[in-house]
């Protein structure tokens, strides 16, 4: 297994620990930062192979070195160095401008930063420096990884295909794919044409009689850029619950940041500023579906799917409309949250169908919300890196232990029906 991520972070360390606990040889860990600094995938791989050449490569009698390489991309989100490099890669004067994996490449980024300026960005707690340019750079990095893997690792398999990861990361494209596949999702505000700013959002909410919506930054994570927004159709009064904080300045544009906690806004100036900023970078609005509750609190389910099997699941319980573990939502098992086995089976089936809409990918965390009225399941998000779940077991295994057991060489060599595909075969 070749993991491309951030060496030593919780994800790559969790994978290595799981492999060690199972008696498997360590994975090869390649660094996003070094790749973005200009080193080739081949050079990075050669260095790591030399360091691991003395390690045994046999597991359960299988020579793992004889298996086709399995490429796993991890989240780049825990490193500001990587974030800054991706913003630079997304610059209009960047050298590598392969936008083939960007779902909306033709849409210009607002006030783009040149490469030199991007490299000078300073880390500021929670600040969202340039989300749309970051995403453009991310898609360019994915395209480069895909190209170089074809050359360096012929016959390799992607656990999650880079094109699918790009699509999952952009909520606009992900929800479109799910809808086209017949997967139930919250109804978009403007199915043919999404709003483009605060004014068009309010106009569409009133004309479609959808007075409560969730507005999302298309490529936000950890609840950043999410707004639970209500508009009174008669008085025009409005309320926005969001993690977005604002710092205003006299001589330069405001700074928007993820405050890490929910804030309540009722003044039009602040609300319109936040919403306009989100739509400039890429926004998505959908019907606000009241979630099923437990002891007066709302919850949804993060359901992990690994190679067409729904496994680990956790209920994210909150006293607010926004349920996210980064907001310190209470964690429960679905049973503890009061879900019947029938509803749990519906959640699992919905999650399986959601990942099947991305047939070149094998692992994702699916956020499933259950309507408090009809108890119908809806897919709110498909997270290609949604397997970082602590203290959740399935058949006695943690998430990474389960994935490593399923992804042994024997599994993906002898079961061609799995979503794992050969690099370049799509």
Task: Specify the residue positions occupied by each region the protein language model found.
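Extreme N-terminal starter segment of soluble prokaryotic enzymes
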Residues: 1-2
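Short, surface-exposed charged micro-motifs
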Residues: 302, 367-369
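Phosphate-binding site of ATP-dependent enzymes
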Residues: 205-324
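C-terminal or late-domain output modules
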Residues: 18-22, 54-69, 315-358
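PAS/PAS-like sensory domains
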Residues: 19, 283, 361-364
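Short, flexible loop/turn elements at secondary-structure junctions
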Residues: 7-8, 34, 192, 219, ...
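C-terminal active-site "lid" helix and adjoining low-complexity regulatory extension at the edge
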Residues: 325-363, 370-426
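Conserved N-proximal alpha/beta basic substrate-recognition cap immediately N-terminal to
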Residues: 6-18, 27-192, 196-199
């Amino acid at each position: 297994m070749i993991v491309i991520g951030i060496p030593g972070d919780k994800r790559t360390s969790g994978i290595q620990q799981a492999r060690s606990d199972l008696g498997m040889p360590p994975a090869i860990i390649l660094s996003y930062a070094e790749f973005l600094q200009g080193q080739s995938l081949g050079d990075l791989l050669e260095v790591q192979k030399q360091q691991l050449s003395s390690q045994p490569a046999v597991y359960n009698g299988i020579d793992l070195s004889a298996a086709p390489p399995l490429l796993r991309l991890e989240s780049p989100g825990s490193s500001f160095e990587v974030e800054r490099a991706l913003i630079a890669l997304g610059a209009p004067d960047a050298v590598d401008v392969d936008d083939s994996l960007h779902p909306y490449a033709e849409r210009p980024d607002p006030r783009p930063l040149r490469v030199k300026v991007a490299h000078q960005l300073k880390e500021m707690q929670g600040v969202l420096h340039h989300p749309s340019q970051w995403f453009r750079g991310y898609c360019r990095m994915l395209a480069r990884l895909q190209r170089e893997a074809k050359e360096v690792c012929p016959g390799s398999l992607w656990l999650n295909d880079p094109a699918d990861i790009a699509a999952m990361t952009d909520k606009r494209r992900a929800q479109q794919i799910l809808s086209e596949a017949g997967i139930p999702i919250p109804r978009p505000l403007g199915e043919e044409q999404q709003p483009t700013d605060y004014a068009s959002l309010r106009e569409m909410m009133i004309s479609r009689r959808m007075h409560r919506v969730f507005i999302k930054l298309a490529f936000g994570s950890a609840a950043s850029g999410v707004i639970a927004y209500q508009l009174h159709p008669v008085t025009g009064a409005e309320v926005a619950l969001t993690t977005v904080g604002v710092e205003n300045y006299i001589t330069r544009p405001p700074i928007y940041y993820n405050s890490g906690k929910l804030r309540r806004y009722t003044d039009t100036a602040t609300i319109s500023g936040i919403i306009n900023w989100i739509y400039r970078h890429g926004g998505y609005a959908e019907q606000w579906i009241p979630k099923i509750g437990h002891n007066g609190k709302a919850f949804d389910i993060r359901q992990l799917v690994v190679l067409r099997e729904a496994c680990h699941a956790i209920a994210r319980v909150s006293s607010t409309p926004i349920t996210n573990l980064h907001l310190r939502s209470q964690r429960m098992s679905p049973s503890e949250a009061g879900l019947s086995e029938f509803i749990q089976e519906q959640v699992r089936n919905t999650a399986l169908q959601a990942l099947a809409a991305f047939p070149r990918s094998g692992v994702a965390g699916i956020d499933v919300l259950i309507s408090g009225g009809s108890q119908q399941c809806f897919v709110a998000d498909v997270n290609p890196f949604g397997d970082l779940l602590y203290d959740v077991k399935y058949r006695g295994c943690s998430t990474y232990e389960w994935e490593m057991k399923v992804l042994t060489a024997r599994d993906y060599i002898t079961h061609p029906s799995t979503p794992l595909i050969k690099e370049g075969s799509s």
